[in-house]
Amino acid sequence: NAKARPYMVCRSGSAGIQRYAQTWCGDNYTSWKSLKYNIPIITGMGLSGQPNEGADIGGFAGPAPTEELFVRWVQNGIFQARFSIHSASNDNTVTEPWMFRESADTIRDAILLRYRFTPYLYSAEYEASQTGAPIMRALVYDFQNDPKAWEESFEFLFGRDILVANVLEEGAKTRTVYLPAGCKWYDWNDKFRCYEGGQTIEVPVTMATIPMFVREGAVIAMADNQLMTMEGDHTTALHLIVAPKGTTTTTLYDDDGITNDFKSGVYRKTTITTTAGERVTMNFASEGSYKDTVETIKVEMIAKEKSPFWVTLDGRKIEHFLTRRKFDAAAEGWYYSQSKKAVEVKYANPAKNHALTVSFEQFDLIGM
């Protein structure tokens, strides 16, 4: 394909290599130590100007990984810019995602989660191409005024808004996590449980657990339709996880993923400006000529204090459903989840600039 963008991975390079190629951590040895220390290698490369870095998942040299080690390595690898499972094991085995039958579902779920993150990851790659911001970021990249962030080497930010603290110890039942100061954090695995930043917590883990925390102020884009490839499939059901705080701007970027047509304006860049307060308003503004593939939008907005009073789309009130069953059956509407303390809103993509407003204002109980 003469129009295709080149893709290059190289073993070595010098300052400026990020303009031409991805790099990787070298031929690592299969061990828990390699899994752990590949993280600061990747984040260190990010601080050195190379935003796209990855490691050989499962280890390149040495024996085949144990089942537990391989699961944990895949769970880490899904956040790397370059996610590659391959090996030249010394025991004549080949490392494959399906090599352990009992853990195949856990490994599959982790890989599918990466594909669900495609809108978020591709937008982060766009940001990297414009600013050099790493895909896997050392905590100190965003939290330079927090002394403890300077000391943390084995947690990282996936893009701007998701803190990841992979399980890195054999047989672990808990994971100690430092949450940087300056904002609140919401536990991805515990119904968005809220933690104040600037503290160390301990969370329980199983083999399936990937400790992740949503940063206050985040808008995280996911695909609710399960993507299976990064270039052939497109997001048709967009899912936005929102943790309102102040005024924030999030950019979603999309193009065909293959050609250089984006250079002539064939791309789609959507800027989401979220303003928090008694009314939370999300303004969506798009540019570019690339066809919008999104058919439906679901907004999952963390709202720990109370349920909204009303929700509008471009000033038109959206129907409120009191039961999950009726909400799930509807094409449009909103529902407040008591278990998560989050409001869910869904609607057909207007295919134009639009505004979604969620009101948490006080209201007249008698007058309503």
Model-derived regions: residue spans:
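Residue-identity detector for threonine
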Residues: T23, T30, T43, T66, ...
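Accessory, solvent-exposed terminal regions and/or long lumenal/extracellular loops of proteins
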Residues: V214-R316, R324-R325, S337-H354, S359-M368
